């Protein structure tokens, strides 16, 4: 994170995460900087502001994390999440098909880390699984 407080605000105030561990300084052989822990549903995110970072933004084309998705429990929740981002002036894509298993939209955090809300429709997933088993047996 290039600005830990800004990231905490985004994940907590915009996405609804809970600050589980307040910002603190870390200094070890593997990390020097500040960190905090936020929890969103079943996901815990350690937010790191590395001392060695010279203000560079996240680049999804580099080796490592491309993006991660938060799971919406329904298509209604997906729409609610998109509306919530609109209310917080966070740009996002349109809700669209997610490879035939549901719907999704993407957006980015303040450092440009690609994020996604994804709804996987259990009926479509079951149909896809059934089709895969039929195709494998032929």
Each language-model region and where it sits:
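A short acidic-to-branched-hydrophobic micro-motif
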Residues: 47-49
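Vicinal oxygen chelate
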Residues: 1-2, 38-39, 56-138
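Core segments of cupin and vicinal oxygen chelate
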Residues: 1-45
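Alpha-helix termination/capping residues and helix-transition junctions
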Residues: 14, 62, 87-89
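Amphipathic alpha-helical "stalk" segments
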Residues: 26-43, 52, 59, 70, ...
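Secondary-structure boundary/capping motif
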Residues: 1-10, 35, 67, 93, ...
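Short, well-ordered turn and helix-capping elements at secondary-structure junctions
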Residues: 21-24, 51-52, 96
